[in-house]
């Protein structure tokens, strides 16, 4: 039996549940809490404790991607086994990028870029318009390090300016998180979903029993009574998942773009499958 989980974010447990229909007693306790907070992860500029040269970079600009979320996963979502109990997701760009110049061997940015290596557990993801993102599977040690700053900016003043209208770790965020400072670390808390008829089903796979919450055959709670949030592991998605390509399974992560203060037009959620690596923005 696969359980679906909502993901709430806040400075404290009470902050996370404020405005939601659940209280702090509904929050699932993590198996370990090495960060001094009984949380499952965090959002904000700080990322996981990976080697700095393996911090994901945009294939187009060479700039380090902006950290979106680091999350410890419940056991049934650890699809690479217990040796990799968590993931980190990074936002890139590239849609409008001018290819970066890496020809000057004395340029500190070029030196830094040439020393960069892809993390051995990284998946580089692309959407249909050519934007790049990354999912990194994390060891317990990388998770336990807690919120860790991105590699320092090595650009000389005025050089290697982002040209892609995307996100990166060195420039200020392009938006706000529902009025909040998105650079600040906020903790992630999990709440098991109750009565989600799509828990354990792949999103959009109607032949396997998946039912859209907008379908007349929907048997779950009506929209105004659903306590679920936009960020979640598995279960019902309110995105237009029938338009997604790729082999999605019940073990997927869905993240809402307003959570990070970003705008991808009318596409509001990112879905990453933790089993197959399928990816889409809906």
List where the protein language model places each region.
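Preference for intrinsically disordered or flexible, low-complexity segments
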Residues: 1-282
């Amino acid at each position: 039996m696969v359980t679906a989980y909502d993901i709430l974010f806040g400075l404290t447990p009470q902050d996370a549940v404020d405005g939601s229909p659940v209280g702090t007693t509904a929050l699932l306790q993590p198996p370990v809490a090495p960060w001094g907070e009984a949380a499952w992860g965090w959002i904000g500029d700080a990322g996981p404790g990976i080697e700095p040269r393996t911090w994901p970079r945009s294939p187009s600009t060479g700039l380090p991607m902006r950290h979106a979320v680091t999350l410890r996963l419940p056991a049934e979502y650890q699809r690479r086994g217990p040796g990799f109990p968590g993931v980190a997701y990074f936002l890139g760009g590239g849609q409008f990028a001018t290819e970066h110049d890496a020809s000057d061997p004395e340029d500190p940015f070029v030196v830094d870029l040439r020393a960069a290596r892809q993390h051995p557990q990284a998946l580089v993801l692309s959407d249909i318009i050519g934007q790049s993102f990354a999912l990194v599977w994390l060891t317990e040690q990388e998770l336990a390090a807690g919120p860790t700053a991105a590699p320092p900016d090595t650009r000389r003043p005025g050089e290697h300016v982002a040209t892609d209208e995307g996100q990166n770790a060195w420039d200020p965020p392009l938006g706000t998180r529902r009025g909040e400072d998105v650079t600040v670390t906020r903790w992630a808390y999990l709440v098991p979903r109750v009565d989600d008829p799509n828990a354990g089903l792949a999103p959009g796979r109607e032949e396997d029993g998946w039912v859209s919450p907008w379908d007349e055959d929907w048997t779950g709670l009506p929209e105004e009574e659903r306590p679920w949030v936009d960020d979640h592991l598995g279960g019902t998605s309110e995105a237009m998942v029938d338009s997604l390509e790729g082999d999605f399974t019940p073990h997927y992560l869905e993240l809402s773009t307003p959570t990070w203060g970003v705008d991808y037009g009318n596409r509001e959620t990112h879905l990453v499958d933790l089993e197959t690596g399928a990816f889409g923005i809906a």
